């Protein structure tokens, strides 16, 4: 569950529900009417940008800005030989950090493009990253190791 300026969103494996904060109306959002995929793994609202990020089990990412949907399939289509699920999304300033089953992907929220990928295991090995937090200039990462 997450929120933007005008709505609260909840995810299911086949789509999401949007509850309007203005009139409490409920709208179903799915592959048939806006989303690019099924298998939602996480949602992250960014109220100050009127933006919603939708991460998927296969690494796909939808970005909703207002009522416009943009698909960013770079992770899904990458040649990485690893599971690509987006576990969670952390937002800091102009960037979103996608915590994935192989590491961390930094998304530029202004340019709407991948800025960098961090393989944080020993010698660049894949590490399943569940979540992260940035505090006091440090990145704290929750992994399976």
Give a label for each model feature.
Residues 1-15:
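Beta-strand-rich domains and repeat architectures in extracellular enzymes and scaffolds
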Residues 7-10, 51-54, 95-98, 138-141:
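Conserved beta-propeller blade signature
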Residues 20-24, 65-68, 108-112:
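Short loop/turn segments that connect beta-strands within beta-propeller blades
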């Amino acid at each position: 569950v997450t929120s933007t300026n005008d709505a609260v969103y909840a995810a299911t494996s086949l789509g999401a529900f949007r509850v309007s904060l203005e009139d409490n109306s409920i709208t179903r959002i799915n592959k048939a009417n806006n989303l690019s995929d099924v298998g939602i793994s996480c949602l992250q609202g960014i109220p100050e940008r009127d933006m919603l990020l939708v991460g998927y089990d296969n690494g796909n990412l939808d970005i909703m800005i207002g009522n416009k949907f943009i698909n960013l399939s770079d992770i899904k289509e990458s040649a990485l030989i690893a599971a690509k699920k987006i576990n969670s999304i952390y937002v800091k300033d102009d960037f979103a950090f996608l915590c994935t089953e192989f590491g961390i992907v930094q998304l530029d929220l202004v340019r709407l493009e991948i800025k960098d990928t961090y393989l944080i295991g020993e010698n660049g090995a894949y590490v399943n990253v569940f979540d992260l937090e940035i505090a006091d200039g440090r990145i704290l990462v929750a992994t399976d190791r």
